[in-house]
Amino acid sequence: MKTISFLCILVCAFLLTSSAPSVAGIGGSLKNKVTKKVEKKAEEKTEKEIEKAAQGSSGSESEGAAESTTTGEAESSGGESVKPGEGVWTNYDFVPGDRVIFFDDFSKSPTGDFPQRLQFVEGNMEVAEWKGQKWLRAADDAKFEIPLSEPLPQRFTIEFDFYGPSSQNTLEMRDGTDTQEEHDWVRLFWYLSCGLHNQKGEVAQVEVPVRVKERIAHCRIMGDGKYIKVYVNEQRVANVPNSSFGRSNSLPFRIWAHPNDATMLTNFRIAEGGKKIMYDQLMAEGKVVTQGILFASGSDEIRAESTPTLKEIGTMLKDHADLKVSIEGHTDNVGEDAANQDLSKRRAASVKAYLMEKYSIEESRLQSQGFGETKPVASNDTPEGRQNNRRVELIKL
């Protein structure tokens, strides 16, 4: 009996000893599976963040109603969309020009080619599709120029979208004159610093938050004679009253990039005009045409970038209590006629409602109408014409 018990103990000990590697193997296998699952989740999260950054290409030619010319939604410092006149947008003063002289979102350029309407200088660049939007992608240092049909006006605005995930992604824009090397130029994302530079060094620059490198940046330049202002998203990074930035028929761009960290650009919009005295124009001409009121894509929701234009309208109406206006929405001919008509009507109504709520303007002083594509001010056969037709007008009553 003792012998049998002893043998049983030996067998159990053998089984436990021999199974130990199997248990360890199971533990190791489980650990590997958990590690892989965590890595997969991290990859999925990264992809979702990139996708989130690229969503909402409101500057594309897919809709006929007046849209923003930039990609993505306006964000506050916390990453959430905000209303006009709120948060970081309270003191924002960029107003887009009202006569577009160049626009290209590369929607008509074949993927893999260099953009049809830009002038190639050097480097490795191509049109690439990224999250439903076409971009100029530079995988190495490169140069190109934007040719203009006329010299850049004394009062101008320039807008485009930039994406570059690392400090190796930098952009410079010069004025295209014969003496451009002696003039100021715009430099963006030079180790996160953005602003105005010249041969002597920086004229004015600001270090933008690191988070800007992690999402699409809306870049804007506003010029009025020698006065140049540069903006990245809601932040003004240069405010120079005596800049030497010149005017010519082209805008040269220089890109710094890396094969693993490509620089991406899209939604170029160059226009004449900018900030001006709205009341004087309304009295002289009986109407004001503005492209400074922007809406979320396919919606009547007013975007935060509209703050300066809405503020000027609201202040004008409060200062002139006898003034009455009709707010009229217009679109291009892209999309269904009925849809454009309805959207332009709702957007005009949104502007009216905002002025009543924010500035306490009496409803009896405001009218709103939508005309869709029925009253174009330019040909719908060109990107510039379609941009000019997407507008809001104030008509003096």
What are these regions (language model features)?
Residues 23-90:
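Glycine- and small hydrophobic-rich membrane-insertion segments that are intrinsically disordered
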Residues 74-118, 282, 286:
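Extracellular carbohydrate-recognition regions
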Residues 106, 160, 213-241:
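Carbohydrate-binding surfaces in secreted/extracellular proteins
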Residues 106, 268-270, 394:
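Extracellular beta-strand elements of beta-rich domains used
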Residues 112-135:
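Extracellular glycan-recognition surfaces and repeat-rich motifs
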Residues 123-128, 237-324, 357:
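Periplasmic peptidoglycan-binding/tethering modules of Gram-negative envelope proteins
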Residues 130-201, 209-210, 272-274:
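Secretory/extracellular carbohydrate-interaction modules
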